[in-house]
Amino acid sequence: MNEIRVTQTLDTLGLRCPEPVMLVRKHIRFLEEGDVLLVIADDPATTRDIPSFCQFMEHTLLKSEIEHIPFQYWVKKGK
């Protein structure tokens, strides 16, 4: 598989719901369509919240690693 080219990394370690998703929303606004935001989190709620956010906001969750903490999510900005 090709390596995912990350545009920006967002560290939300230590933050709890709803802060991680709020920060993702804030940071992704400043990215261009097609850019990738790597989100690093340790809040178990992000395993549900990040995929839901992507679907609702029409972004693409390219990959997630949620077997071990820290969790990692690669979010590609949509339109």
Swiss-Prot record:
Q: Does the keyword Transferase apply?
A: no
Where does this polypeptide localize? Answer: Cytoplasm
Record keywords, A-Z: Cytoplasm
Keyword check for Cytoplasm, yes or no.
yes
Highest rank taxon of the organism: Bacteria
Per the record, its GO cellular-component terms are:
cytoplasm
GO molecular function: any one?
sulfur carrier activity
Tell me where it mainly resides: cytoplasm
Q: Where is the signal peptide?
A: none
- Name the active site residues: C17
Q: Which Gene3D superfamilies match?
A: TusA-like domain
**UniProt-listed GO biological process terms:** tRNA wobble position uridine thiolation
Q: What HAMAP family does the entry give?
A: Thiourid_synth_A (MF_00413)
Q: Which family does it belong to?
A: Belongs to the sulfur carrier protein TusA family.
Function as written in the Swiss-Prot or TrEMBL entry = Sulfur carrier protein which probably makes part of a sulfur-relay system.
Which NCBIfam families does the annotation name?
PRK00299.1 (NF001423)
List the protein's name: Sulfur carrier protein TusA
Organism, scientific name: Pasteurella multocida (strain Pm70)
